[in-house]
Design a protein with these regions (language model features):
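Canonical Rossmann dinucleotide-binding motif of NAD(H)/NADP(H)-dependent dehydrogenases/reductases
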Residues: 13-47
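Active-site loop immediately N-terminal to the catalytic Tyr-X3-Lys motif
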Residues: 110-113, 160-166, 188-189, 225, ...
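Short C-terminal tail/terminal secondary-structure segment
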Residues: 3-13, 30, 160, 220, ...
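Short, small/polar-rich loop/turn modules that mediate ligand/substrate recognition or access, typified
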Residues: 187, 192, 248-250
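Residue(s) in the substrate-gating loop at a strand-loop-helix junction
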Residues: 155
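Active-site helix of classical SDR
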Residues: 135, 171, 179
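Substrate-binding pocket helix/loop in short-chain dehydrogenase/reductase
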Residues: 111-112, 119-124, 206, 214, ...
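Catalytic Tyr-X3-Lys loop
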Residues: 106, 113-132, 147, 151, ...
């Protein structure tokens, strides 16, 4: 199948019209930025966060040039105080947070016998603990209001074994469990928590941290013979963030034919 980079979704649907959306790891050209753009196209007011301040500023400027209401603030999800500052900033701009999209994650390639404690802990602190911190902060705001949506970025490796991915797979499996359990805790308040699990999405971060031979192998496993484009994952996130998925909570949507 042709690897088209041109989105073919209908525009102007306003699925998130007026919603206040916060997205972590949203700078650059990956899933986070694609999600920010799609949310803005659907009428949302969007706050981007990232640890890369220059890329963040460029991403915000790019979206603002299209007349979207977009802001940016640096945030390291491994630091609880910065996560709280992120929520506080969003509330100062939007008066509320309707949707929290937890996209921050960290991977790598290392067999367990060669992995240091530091490598293991770094991946889990960003990918799992960071998602927990953002989910917790968002729920503390949303539950009293009895409304809100959280969407987490998981991965099919949370279901499926893969060599060299013990740390990342454990973290993403944890994100899935966190999604299910927090969804149960928040359901009485009408707050929904779901996740998307991409299989293989082509973006610069993955290309930077992965073995090229592994990427070729992963691409060959895909039924379409290619990785997903970031906007293709972003469309699923928009669906989960919108009222179209209003009766879904605690679910992890596989963006692949390979589950599990």
């Amino acid at each position: 199948m042709e690897n088209s980079e041109t989105p073919n979704y209908p525009e102007g649907r306003d699925l998130l019209k007026g919603k206040a959306v916060v997205i972590t790891a949203a700078a650059g050209s990956g899933i986070g930025f694609a999600t920010a753009k799609r949310c803005a196209e659907e009428g949302a007011r969007v706050l981007l966060s990232d640890t890369h301040e220059n890329r963040l500023a460029e991403s915000v400027s790019s979206l603002q040039s299209e007349q979207f209401e977009v802001y940016g603030i640096p945030c390291d999800v491994t630091k609880e105080n910065e996560v709280q500052e992120l929520l506080n900033f969003a509330i100062s701009k939007f008066k509320t947070v309707d949707v929290m999209i937890n996209n921050a994650g960290l991977g790598g390639q290392s067999n367990l016998i060669d992995m240091s404690d530091e490598e293991w802990e770094k991946v889990l602190d960003v990918t799992l603990n960071g998602t927990m911190r953002c989910t917790r902060a968002a729920l503390r705001h949303m539950i009293p209001l009895k409304r809100g949506v959280i969407v987490n970025n998981a991965s099919v490796v949370g279901w499926r074994a893969q060599k060299g991915q013990c740390h990342y797979a454990a973290a993403k499996a944890g994100v899935m469990a966190l999604t299910r359990c927090s969804a149960m805790e928040a359901a009485d308040a009408g707050v929904r928590v779901n996740a998307v699990a991409p299989s293989f999405a082509s973006h610069p971060f993955l290309e930077k941290v992965s073995d090229p031979l592994l990427l070729e192998e992963l691409e060959a496993q895909e039924p379409f013979g290619r990785g997903a484009q970031p906007w293709e994952i972003a469309n699923i996130i928009v669906f989960l963030a919108s009222d179209l998925s209003g009766y879904m909570t605690g679910e992890c949507v596989s963006a692949s034919s390979q589950h599990p």
